[in-house]
Amino acid sequence: YHNFFEHYGLSATRGFGIQLLTGKSIGGGTSINWQTSLETPTEVLNEWDQLTKQQDYFNSDVFKESIKHVVDNLGVTTEYNHIPLKEEKLAEGFEKNNISYRVIPKNNRSTHGMECGFCAFGCGYESRNSSYKIWLENGNFNGNIYSDTGIQKIIINNDKATHIEVENNGTASRIEVERVILAGGSLNTPRILLNSGYKNPQLGKNLKTHPVSGVAAKFNEQQQPWYGSMQGMHSEDFLFKTNNYGYLLQGLPMHPSIFFPYFPNFVSSAEDFIESYNHWSGAIVLTSDTS
């Protein structure tokens, strides 16, 4: 957790209203994820065009070709995925309620290691097509990468970035730079800019999240909630209920170290949960909030 996740996987909003499971490894969400790789729906692209007044930029051939380039290079496919044992009850429930579902596309290159079930902690089988493996290992990157190094602030002199202050394994240093491209994500980019002295009142105030709720149940049959494909299938039947807003239903891997922090109501019955762990299965409901 200390190597791959922000704040050991326990990042949260002020007041702990929403917990944020965010990665920090090289390769980003293509390296530390559940391998679920979904293209942005046309309905959302239409909404982005409307909100940004970009005159069909997000629906343009150029943008769609860029998405296709990424998808193709990451090898996103359903070929190496299937519904694992832990999601069979969910699929059964969908069928009984006439809810359609489909196998989730993933960015893995083969079935090797697919049943491991620990993809969220890094792939020990090198079977994941992360951006690190695709673009960096193939010689498409000309430069140096410094892992375990966090940028604290940018030093500005005469309206120009001249240095960055970084910390590596507890050691702080200042590095001279010619230019800076800041790509710290929606959580860290505002923080770095604020630390650097930027005064824009909008910095850090417009983050939108898509809240996730979870359900879990204990069954008589063994479920192996830690094993197999991290996520095998999902349902989009309720994704666009009203004006593009609704919810997405997906299976849930239930490793205790991930499960307990995000399902605090189970803590009081932790002993029973651990003793009967092999008989539990769960699902998540991803709410579509403002884009």
Regions found by a protein language model. Name each.
Residues F16-Q19, K86-E88, K133, N168, ...:
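Short alpha-helical segments and helix-capping/turn motifs at coil-helix boundaries
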Residues N200-S291:
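FAD cofactor-binding and catalytic pocket of flavoenzymes
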Residues W34, L51-I151:
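Conserved redox-cofactor binding core of oxidoreductases
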Residues L45, L90, I192-L193:
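Hydrophobic packing residues within well-ordered alpha-helices of enzyme cores
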Residues T149, I154, I164-H234:
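Glycine-rich loop(s) and the adjacent beta-strand/alpha-helix scaffold that form part
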Residues Y1-E47, S60-D61, V166, K199-M230:
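N-terminal glycine-rich phosphate/pyrophosphate-binding loop and immediately adjacent elements
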Residues I156-N158:
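Short, conserved beta-turn/loop elements at beta-strand boundaries and strand-helix junctions
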Residues T22-K24, E92-G93, E137-N138, A172-R174, ...:
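A general structural signal for short secondary-structure junctions and capping/turn motifs
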